[in-house]
């Protein structure tokens, strides 16, 4: 599944995973992306949307 929101273009965030001995390895935080059916220009379409856009009401689900 895509890890980018089609509405706000939110993508993954990057940082370090730090162990107990303080060694660092790279990791990523993926946004919570859901597949939502909505109407775009009157035609039904599936979009990959983050949950913050769904909560904000930026997409109409049906």
UniProtKB/Swiss-Prot annotation:
A family per Pfam: Ribosomal_L28
Keyword DNA damage: no
Identification of the protein by name: Large ribosomal subunit protein bL28
Keyword Methyltransferase: no
InterPro entries in UniProt: Bacterial_rp_bL28 (IPR050096), Ribosomal_bL28 (IPR026569), Ribosomal_bL28/bL31-like_sf (IPR034704), Ribosomal_bL28_bact-type (IPR001383), Ribosomal_bL28_sf (IPR037147)
Keywords: Ribonucleoprotein, Ribosomal protein
Gene Ontology annotations of biological process type: translation
Similarity section: Belongs to the bacterial ribosomal protein bL28 family.
Single GO term (MF): structural constituent of ribosome
HAMAP family in UniProt: Ribosomal_bL28
GO CC, any one term: ribonucleoprotein complex
């Amino acid at each position: 599944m895509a890890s980018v929101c089609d509405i706000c273009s939110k993508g993954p965030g990057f940082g370090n995973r730090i162990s107990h001995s303080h060694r660092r390895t790279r990791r990523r935080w993926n946004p919570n992306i859901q597949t939502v059916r909505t109407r775009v220009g009157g035609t039904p379409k599936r979009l990959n949307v983050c949950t913050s856009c769904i909560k904000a009401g930026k997409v109409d689900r049906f």
